[in-house]
């Protein structure tokens, strides 16, 4: 039985988990990744040790936040996102696309605590249409302390409800299931209570926003904490972030999960491709009427604004991403680094590959501690930090290597073929929807031949069009 089937089987057995909601938001959905982790066989979440690095707090962002909450109250379209998506020369191209698509749109932006992204707000030509949410973080700390007793009461009521639900169920099958139940009883009430407090505060912050026609979440905590408490009647929308594959805990839900929290599941989805639309209709609880296919707005706007690199393709580019797709990332670096060391050796010694150099692009959530780890273990490679322009690098790369990163799809659109390194037994068909070439410790020599290279690239581009 696949991980997906195991999770859905667990959820169908305990469907009451979807009934514990805060203004229509099912709190359990925040725990699907963690439940999946336990079901997959890892009894405890493991953390990779690396340098803890935090970006600055910008008082000016907090001040602007306080001022703009009042200034923007007549806006018709509210977009919730994060400065983490300022990945293209300091701009959030997907948010810009949404601002053009919907009337009188403004963007509410969480800080990422990544300096290169947070500071980009100050240089943005569209700054007047952005409102940092930084002040919420400050106000929440004060508000939650003042309402600590209420939070404790909410937590205990939720815990009692969970205990009662589970006690009425018979046939807990094994130790893993018991472990999951204990975890949910311990942790889910905390999330429930903090969500109630968070929604209370957002209700106060947005209480005078009476002209809302559209509320859009683009990885901005909108669907959980903000959209459920906005005033008036409006359309709730979510822009797809990342590639949705056969199993994605943020989109693939069991049948009948939407019977209780109807408003949460009734949101409109803006998707990248027809294959994703088909997947959500057939495998999840969404209907065709809820879905609009728009392509990948970030890539569309990037090519429109910046074009594509005309420089020589010099890199063999590895995209690092232990946080993405993968719930079992504890051994990621110890497995990836030896493979990359072998690739570096091949580039140094094999005449066919000597004109290329190994480069590593960090995931946006990997910091300088990881940069140092790669540089220490593979000193001849070039490591690009988490703020480097991904699409620019793809345009300069002859080949893209990854374990499970969905950058594969983006690479194909920038004419860069992808090969996979093995990791945790994942199959490319399960992750990407089609077969992808794999390597162990050596790059495939056939791709040096231009005809085979072009044929493989054409294959990847054709497959990618289903998803992008």
Regions found by a protein language model. Give the residues of each.
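Catalytic-core helical/loop segments in enzymes performing group transfer/polymerization on anionic/lipid-linked
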Residues: 1-468
């Amino acid at each position: 039985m696949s991980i997906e089937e195991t999770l859905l089987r667990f959820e169908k057995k305990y469907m009451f988990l979807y009934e514990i909601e805060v203004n229509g938001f099912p709190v359990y959905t925040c725990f699907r990744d963690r439940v999946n982790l336990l079901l997959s066989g890892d009894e405890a979440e493991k953390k990779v040790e690396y340098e803890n690095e935090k970006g600055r707090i910008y008082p000016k962002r907090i001040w602007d936040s306080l001022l703009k909450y009042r200034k923007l109250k007549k806006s018709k379209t509210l977009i919730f996102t994060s400065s983490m998506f300022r990945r293209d020369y300091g701009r959030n191209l997907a948010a810009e696309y949404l601002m053009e698509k919907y009337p009188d749109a403004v963007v509410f932006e969480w800080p990422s605590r990544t300096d290169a992204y947070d500071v980009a707000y100050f240089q943005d030509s569209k700054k007047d249409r952005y409102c940092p949410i930084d002040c919420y973080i400050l106000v929440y700390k004060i508000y939650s302390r003042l309402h600590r007793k209420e939070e404790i009461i909410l937590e205990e009521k939720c815990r009692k409800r969970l205990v009662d639900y589970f006690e009425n169920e018979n046939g807990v099958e094994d130790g893993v299931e018991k472990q999951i139940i204990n975890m949910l009883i311990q942790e889910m009430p905390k999330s429930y209570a903090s969500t109630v407090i968070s929604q209370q505060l957002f209700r106060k912050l947005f209480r005078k926003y009476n002209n809302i026609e559209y509320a859009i979440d683009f990885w901005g905590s909108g669907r959980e904490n903000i959209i459920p408490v906005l005033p008036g009647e409006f359309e709730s929308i979510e822009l797809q972030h990342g590639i949705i594959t056969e199993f994605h805990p943020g989109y693939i839900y069991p049948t009948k999960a939407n019977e209780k929290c109807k408003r949460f599941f009734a949101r409109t989805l803006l998707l990248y491709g027809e294959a994703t639309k088909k997947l959500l209709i057939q495998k999840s609880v969404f209907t065709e009427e809820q879905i609009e296919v728009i392509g990948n707005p970030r890539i569309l706007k990037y090519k429109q604004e910046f074009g594509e690199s005309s420089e020589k393709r010099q890199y063999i580019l590895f995209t690092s991403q232990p946080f993405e797709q993968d719930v079992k990332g504890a051994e990621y670096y110890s497995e990836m680094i030896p493979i990359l060391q072998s690739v570096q050796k091949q580039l140094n010694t094999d005449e066919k590959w000597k004109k290329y150099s190994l480069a590593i692009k960090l995931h946006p959530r990997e910091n300088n501690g990881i940069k140092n780890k790669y540089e220490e273990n593979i000193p001849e490679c070039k490591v690009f930090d988490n703020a480097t322009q991904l699409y620019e690098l793809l345009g300069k790369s002859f080949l893209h290597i990854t374990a499970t990163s969905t950058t594969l799809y983006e690479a194909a659109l920038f004419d860069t073929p992808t090969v996979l390194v093995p990791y945790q037994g994942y199959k490319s068909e399960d992750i990407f929807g089609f077969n992808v070439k794999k390597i162990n410790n050596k790059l495939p020599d056939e791709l040096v031949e231009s005809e085979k290279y072009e044929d493989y690239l054409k294959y990847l581009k054709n497959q990618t069009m289903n998803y992008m």
